[in-house]
């Protein structure tokens, strides 16, 4: 594991990434925007660098609120992303028990996804356990499906325009808080613009 430290703009140093990757690189895992609220404008270039050496790119969607309706992981070429439903989709953390996650993968990784997967045969949905290339089952339980139902209802209720408005308000709130923090004597942020 190689940690890439931020450059003068507060995002991982792209030159450090170029120096770190090789034919032995398995993957890059990155969050965008960073937890500091800084957007990595070179995210597509990061993905291209890792793909050029045969690595995969995993997008941690922990801070997805600032991206709804503005950009998509697919647009940057990510191979896999996972969602923190309790952060971005109004589902309480744990939701009365162990959480249920959501992840998306590109077509070439689909056969490796943990079993079972939910499939549709044209008439009904079913759980598919017959996945010979899968990493198998991760837990004895299925998580808490209510988290997924809440997430689905949240997305359907808001629709595309509402989801984009969430992103716009998230960015506005982040910038407002940044300005307010910088008004406090003794507080500075190394990457504040």
Q: How does the language model describe each region?
A:
Residues 80-193:
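Active-site C-terminal subdomain of aminotransferase-like
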Residues 1-122:
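Conserved PLP-enzyme active-site core in the AAT-like
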């Amino acid at each position: 594991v190689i940690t890439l430290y931020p450059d003068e703009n507060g995002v991982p140093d792209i030159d450090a990434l170029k120096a770190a990757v090789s034919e032995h690189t398995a993957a890059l895992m990155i969050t965008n925007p960073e937890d500091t609220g800084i957007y990595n404008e070179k995210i597509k270039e990061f993905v291209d660098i890792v793909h050029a050496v045969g690595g995969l790119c995993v997008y941690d969607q922990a801070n997805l609120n600032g991206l709804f309706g503005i950009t998509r992981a697919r647009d940057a070429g990510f191979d896999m992303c996972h969602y923190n439903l309790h952060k971005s989709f109004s589902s309480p953390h744990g939701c009365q028990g162990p959480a249920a996650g959501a992840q998306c993968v590109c077509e070439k990784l689909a056969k490796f996804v943990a079993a079972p997967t939910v499939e549709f045969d044209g008439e009904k949905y079913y759980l598919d356990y017959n996945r010979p290339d899968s990493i198998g089952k991760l837990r004895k339980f299925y998580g808490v499906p209510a988290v997924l139902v809440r997430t689905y209802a949240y997305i359907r209720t808001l629709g595309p325009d509402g989801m984009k408005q969430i992103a716009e308000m998230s960015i506005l709130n982040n910038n407002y808080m940044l300005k307010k923090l910088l008004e406090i004597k003794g507080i500075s942020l190394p990457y504040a613009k």
